[in-house]
Amino acid sequence: MEVKAVYKYARISAKKMRDVAQEIQGLSVSQATDILSYTPKKGAYLLNKTLKSALANAENNAELSVDTLVVKSVMVDEGPTMRRTMPRARGSANMIRKRTSHITVILADQEG
């Protein structure tokens, strides 16, 4: 059985999140939590929050055992971009793009 958790509009670019997401794909939940808690990146903290949410969904909603769960997939998609202007010299302006992302974590039972 599969369980998922979604974190929408996370204030980090999808490109930065994908580097962290690739590290935990296919690992057990305990290994993934250990790796994320010792990774010194903002994306690791946000992904750990989403992983814990998926774990809580598995325990409470699906009534699955935590010990047998594996991270089946982690998808990081681009969310909407907030655009801001920054004044520059001679009356011009540059665009500042504040990117967001949607994080989806899917957990599944370990096979075998």
UniProtKB/Swiss-Prot annotation:
InterPro entries: Ribosomal_uL22, Ribosomal_uL22_bac/chlpt-type, Ribosomal_uL22_bac/org-type, Ribosomal_uL22_CS, Ribosomal_uL22_sf. GO terms for cellular component: cytosolic large ribosomal subunit. Keywords: Ribonucleoprotein, Ribosomal protein, RNA-binding, rRNA-binding. Pfam families: Ribosomal_L22. GO terms for biological process: translation. PROSITE patterns: RIBOSOMAL_L22. The keyword RNA-binding applies. One of its GO terms (molecular function) is structural constituent of ribosome. Belongs to the universal ribosomal protein uL22 family. This protein binds specifically to 23S rRNA; its binding is stimulated by other ribosomal proteins, e.g. L4, L17, and L20. It is important during the early stages of 50S assembly. It makes multiple contacts with different domains of the 23S rRNA in the assembled 50S subunit and ribosome. Part of the 50S ribosomal subunit. This is Large ribosomal subunit protein uL22. The lineage of its organism: Bacteria, Pseudomonadati, Verrucomicrobiota, Verrucomicrobiia, Verrucomicrobiales. The gene is rplV.
